[in-house]
Amino acid sequence: MKNGEYFLTYRYTNASVEIVVMSGDTQAYKVDICKMLRASFKRPWQQDTMAYDMIDVADENGVITILLENAVMMIMLTISLAPDGTLSVETEWKNTSGEELKDVMLGISIPVKAEDADGIVIPSVCYDEGLAETGDFKCEYLSGGGFVAEEHRLPIPFVCINNVKRAAGNSLALFSVPSKCNLNEDYDSEWSLGIVREEDNISMLLISGGVMVNGQKDFVYGGLNTNVPYERGYFDMPADTEVVKKFAIYCWEADKKSEAFDNVIKKSFDLFSPDNKIQTSYNDFLKYKSIALKNRYVESDDFAGYVKKLSDAHEDMHYTTMSDGWTIDNIAAAWCDAQNSLELRKREGIMHARKCVDFYLNTSKCKKRGLRQLYFDNATMKWRYSMQGDIIPSCEFGLMVSYLADIILLFKEHCLEVPESWSEAFEDSCDFLCLIRKMTKEGIYPQYWTPDGGVGEPDMFAGGVTCVSALAKAYSVTGEHQYITVAVKALIKYYECMILRNKLFIKKKKQEDIKSACYDKEAYVYFMTAAFDCYEATRDEKLLKMVCAAAEILMTYVNFVDYPLKRDSKLNKMDFDMRGLSYASRREHALNVIFPSYEMKTAGEITGNALLRKMADITVNAAVRLASSGEGEYGLIAAGEQPEVLYTTNWSESAQTDEWRGGYGDFNTLRSLTWSFRQVLKLSSSNII
């Protein structure tokens, strides 16, 4: 059967039949049906094949139907080919044994030779990490034999193996069409998807609920570096009952690894058509957020900031006097307050913003010129270098300088006075970031600096890319070419590591208190923002390509599917749609709103990339929907507040199963409040929403 440039055929082997997809005269890939099918009837589940008798193979109207049978099962496969070479398969298993089968696990396995597996992609879990010299997986969750996750744990239900060295079909992806395994009556059970080692092969595995972490079957990754027993994937199959599963196999050629993301994202849009329509208007959202900032603001003779927060007694809408501390997110909040007030032609928010920035810059100086303390302990009313102790993290410092640049640019744009103390402090910090000796030997920023300006933790670290944003904006503020020169040079170094080699992550540490080190999605967010800021300052199209490359990776963190939640969960009782929200990180399998929707939408407008525009709309609409209107959503009757994280998988912060698949965090930080506020304000002021 021909379809476009691709050709679908089959051929008999000794005891099976092979489905072959041809690309012109070249074989793109083939699937041995009997070797593909898997069945297990014991615990822990096995990856066993079974012998089958071939009953019939038919090819009618472009659809191949295969019927197989043995003493236990009859299986029918219906196979078709799309114009782009995508193989669509529906598999139906029927229990023909005459008795109930216990502890059943059904599925399929698509093998690739281990030497051909240059890179592996599992959305939000593993990115382009293949095999080590020992033959084990490099990725921390696959090491030991593999990783198989519930469909709902993956923002897009696919796994992918890349081999850029091989011509014609050098990337192969297995997509699952999400579905429940309906024979589990006591609880909802979905299919599962992952990558495992099978002898000399790396196999993409799709099974009816079994899970694996680090090669350990019947375990899920249930918390921060915690593998939790989970045996709910099994079911009993009465005689004559059927189980049906649909999936797709997609193969394409890519000249380089970065093209793998581009192709797999396009295919994901084709298969799942993600959307999240507007349910809260942008005007209402901005109104709710402005109320929240007004409620959070507090000042005294020697203090100013957006540090009030809801107490535990939500029902009386009481705000505590102070939260735990003043963080750099106060400067982001100050920009939001000022920008929104300028749009509304009101003075109050501008005055609050000015006082907040004045408080910070007048009281947070370090001995080392250019550096600043980043955290004010509200309990002791004293500054600390950071929440991590006597260090100044490069990620937070870069964000602080970048946020300061934003508010300086805003005031200049609207002809508002920028105090000399602001300009002096800002330029001192930017001058510090231009010092080569304050970088690592690779030419990027260290994980942190000591209070005297010394370089700490020289290991390669992604979070410092925020400093690039700060310098790019500094060029826009001052016109000083040194700032943009240093920024672009450092950005290229980050690009080589993060995008081309995918190697720049914080050193893996097995420890409980790992939350502050979860920088993978956020590192891409900050890289994309930095590349966008450099592009805006220079209009260099090479930098725009870096923006788009990061955007493609980031899109794989976004939920494309509105998976079912636990029946009695808090979120399931609401009209909750998880599409458009993105996973926090590889270690934190929860959803949040941290996503560069404005930069993605603008890049899509400039390049004409419809997928970028679509994804930006989906993500910003999802974030807007989370804001409380003051009517009690998410237990928050204060307008504009929102939950920080949402637990939509078998994972939670503390590995407590009662929050799994439908819970959410009760805390609501200033960071989450201001992130979505900033995105909508930027989109609104640019007239692209």
Give residue ranges: language-model regions:
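Intrinsically disordered, low-structural-confidence terminal and linker regions
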Residues: 1-5
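Assembly/interface hotspot detector across virion components, adhesins/toxins, and nucleic-acid enzymes
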Residues: 10, 57, 79, 374-383
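Glycan-recognition and catalytic cores of secretory/periplasmic carbohydrate-active enzymes
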Residues: 145, 181, 212, 232, ...
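Terminal domain-start segments
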Residues: 6-9, 19
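Beta-strand/loop-rich accessory regions of lumenal/periplasmic or secreted enzymes
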Residues: 13-15, 21-239
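Short, charged beta-turn/beta-strand-edge "cap" motif at the junction between a beta-strand
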Residues: 249-253
